[in-house]
A protein has these predicted regions:
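Conserved phosphate- and dinucleotide-binding cores of soluble alpha/beta proteins
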Residues: 2-10, 20-21, 59-230
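Small/polar loops that bind or transfer phosphate-bearing groups
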Residues: 32-33, 53-57, 140
Length: 230
């Protein structure tokens, strides 16, 4: 039986193989955020000459990539990326994802939107029939937090303003936004809910990646890494 950390390491390794096999040398790679993405960064580090550069989805990933010596490019300088590799907090049978547990949802969505192919890497615990057990992160403009929270409550969620782990201060994103975590949703139509939440004034982005879903899933299970396409 593998531990969750071992499963994450296995999918990170599989993603390295997937990228090196399918991406022509000299291309630019999109890189996600989180503990699984960190393992992926470490796995591709010895192969960085394969890439002209990378586009990163958070300051944390940028720091890690630069420590390894990667050339991190501004997303504005890139028109398209062949691949974007990132983790997820939940993924449903259609490849719709719920992301943002690490707070990087907005930049993740921006980089994912540039990519021709989204490679989702996660351990088996992230695969669900219906998303919503993991609280849905919504990045907001701070001055709107109370009114956005009221609107999200109307959708049936229990809303919490994210705080820094182990502290009482409000968690601030790389974009100087705040995050509302919405618990208790049963997300049967993620494409519709993603659009609906985006319509609330003060919302910057929400953690549903349904309109731009995964193209390839590499999932770590008891039998090893399983590859699925959507
Ligand atoms: C960060 C994310 C991550 O991809 C998601 O939280 C999964 O993280 P981990 O790989 O640590 O389980 O969306 O904003």
């Amino acid at each position: 039986m593998y531990t969750q950390d071992q499963l994450k390491a296995m999918v990170a390794e599989a993603a390295k193989d997937e990228v090196l096999k399918n991406m022509a040398p000299g291309g630019i790679l999109g890189v996600g955020t989180g503990s699984t993405a960190n393992l992926f960064i470490d796995a591709i580090a010895p192969h960085q000459s394969h890439f002209a550069g990378v586009v990163s989805s958070s300051q944390a990933s940028t720091d890690r990539l630069q420590k390894h010596g990667f050339k991190v490019l501004d997303s504005n300088s890139v028109q398209s990326l062949p691949m974007y590799v990132d983790g997820a907090d939940e993924i449903d049978p259609q490849g719709h994802m719920l992301k943002g547990g690490g707070g990087a949802l907005t930049r993740e969505k921006i980089v994912a939107q540039l990519a021709q192919s989204f490679i989702c890497i996660c351990d088996g615990s992230k695969q669900v029939d219906v998303m919503g057990k993991f609280p849905l992160p919504v990045e907001i403009i701070p001055m709107a937090h109370a009114q956005v929270a009221r609107e999200l409550e109307k959708l049936g969620g229990v809303v919490t303003l994210r705080k820094v782990k182990g502290a009482d201060s409000v968690y601030v994103t790389d974009n100087q936004g705040w995050i509302l975590d919405v618990a208790g949703l049963s997300i049967k139509d993620p494409v519709d809910l993603e659009s609906q939440i985006n319509q609330i004034p003060g919302v910057v982005c929400n953690g549903l990646f349904a309109r731009r879903k995964a193209n390839v899933l590499l999932i770590g299970e008891a039998a090893g890494v399983r590859r699925q396409t959507y």
